[in-house]
Amino acid sequence: EQMNEPETRHPYYYKWLKKIASSATRKMHRQLFAYNKDVVRRDMTLTSSIFEPLPSKYAEYISTVSRSGFDIIQVEFYPLISLGYLLPEGVQTIFVHHELRYIRNENEMTFLDRVTDEERMLYRIGKDFEHSALQTYKHVIVLTEVDRQILIDFIGEENRIHVSPAVVPMTDACDKQVVPTGFRLTFVGSEGHYPNLDAVVWFCQKIAPCLRSQGFHFTFQVVGPWKSSYVRELQMSCPELELVGYVEDLHNFLNGSIVLVPIRIGSGMRMKILDAVSSKAPFVTTTKGVEGINFHHEEECLIADSALEFASAVIRLAGDQDLQVKLANQAVEQLQKLYSPQKMLDRRLAVYNQIL
């Protein structure tokens, strides 16, 4: 029956030693990943937050097209923020700020082992550039009221900063049933966006050990492209991690799981939360993850900010099917009430009408 086991003098002692060896190997890989790879510095946005010249032909094209008689010219995403310097004065210009860059830089710098003088310099230069570039636009749109208040403090001029959340397709959320689970955990997001990598690393290195120590058995399925050697090392320290890749129907895939949002970095709206709600899947998030979205602890979700608290929230939710159903249904109701596609479209149109 034990064809694969070698003959040993003390079989039970040998099995015990194998378990110790397996545990030690996982712990060794955790240490290698944590300390030999400076992942934060590799992927942080600090060095890409200062001005970088645009291709000359592209800049010339934008300059020409923008003078073609538009009523409103709208620019989105931080890599294009410098276009404001090219746009003509006689037109209403808008920058849609999906994520406040200096806030993200501040968040990422808190996870460095040591902040160098050069990094402090880059942070200040980037923050000054962001401030100046935003001043070149007549109006700024952010996705949450939290970001609006931050920008008011940052650049002033309250009347030109507007809130217009992202439009969230509701699909067939109302028709779905909540499918409770006792072990299946999911996360949505690509490795290329560093806040996602930080979230998965934090889960695997800090939260997962807390789950194991309490005897909780689980699978952790991560949706999106994850291919680097860092992630393969991470799988060795967290065997519960399953890299799913692309899924055809995200909402059907998430249904029947507990969605995790262990996000510690960034600003704006976390679309992964809205995907969870549209999937009728209950979710556990950090305060940062749900920031700016009008969901509350114990009402639409569970919120926890330390590894131990996050693990405890996961175990509690996995063990309470009624709570899963309650949170998922109440989150859908809140989403429909506050973030229905038509309401969001009307809100954006109201901003445009106000500007014109």
What are these model-derived regions, one by one?
Residues 297-308, 316-321:
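Conserved acidic donor-binding segment of nucleotide-sugar-dependent glycosyltransferases
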